[in-house]
């Protein structure tokens, strides 16, 4: 399932990249999906993660934050998007259902990230948030919105490749995709997990829009205000 979702996401990104003639987005999406497919065929069937989900006090705290903040943004978006649509040119299609669908899918993917003990599950949630962010930032389809959406997707795909490198490191060095087992191994033998942790840190920096990747989040402010609020709060 995770591999199928990854392929579908890459296909959507490549379609937009071809449509808007953005080579970097297409190349990075291609690299990511090829790396994912090779990883799946080489290792995934031989690596079992007994517990796909993991609950602790920190994950429950994050659930509360996502639920409260995310729900508040969605409620605010109801009125905002009604006014937004009213200011659209006469006869313009009402795309609010797609907007709210993307918001809800984004929040759902965040829950997957928070609760996943399986690194592949987390990676899938990670990719879903990347695609949703791209579509939300480019919602208005203006030239500026499209340019900023591609800036986001390029930086986030680079981070996704960093996450993929971490998965490869885990498969080759520690032989597990379980976060719990990974942490135990890291405590007992830090050298085995150093490269994977470094790759995960790079992925986190890009997703959180930390320097020098902060420009994609600033570009999100061209989107409707609920999008900007959602992305700023989630990072």
What residues fall within each predicted segment?
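...captures the hydrophobic TM-helix bundle architecture rather than a specific catalytic motif
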Residues: 1-235
């Amino acid at each position: 399932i995770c591999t199928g979702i990854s392929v579908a996401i890459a296909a959507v990104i490549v379609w937009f990249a071809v449509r808007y003639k953005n080579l970097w987005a297409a190349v990075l999406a291609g690299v990511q999906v090829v790396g994912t497919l090779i990883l799946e065929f080489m290792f995934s069937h031989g690596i079992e993660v007994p517990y796909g989900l993991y609950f602790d006090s920190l994950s429950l705290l994050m659930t509360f934050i996502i639920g409260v903040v995310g729900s508040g943004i969605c409620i605010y978006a109801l009125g905002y998007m009604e006014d937004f649509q009213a200011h659209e040119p006469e006869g313009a299609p009402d795309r609010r259902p797609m907007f709210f669908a993307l918001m809800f899918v984004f929040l759902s993917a965040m829950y997957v990230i928070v609760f996943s003990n399986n690194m592949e599950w987390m990676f899938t949630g990670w990719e879903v948030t990347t695609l949703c962010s791209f579509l939300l930032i480019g919602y208005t389809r203006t030239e500026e919105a499209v340019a900023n959406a591609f800036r986001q997707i390029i930086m986030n795909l680079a981070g996704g490749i960093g996450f993929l490198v971490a998965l490869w490191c885990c498969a080759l060095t520690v032989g597990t995709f379980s976060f719990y087992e990974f942490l135990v191994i890291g405590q007992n033998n830090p050298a085995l997990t150093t490269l994977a942790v470094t790759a995960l840190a790079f992925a986190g920096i890009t997703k959180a829009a930390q320097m020098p990747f902060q420009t994609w989040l600033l570009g999100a402010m061209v989107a409707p205000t609920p999008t900007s609020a959602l992305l700023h709060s989630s990072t």
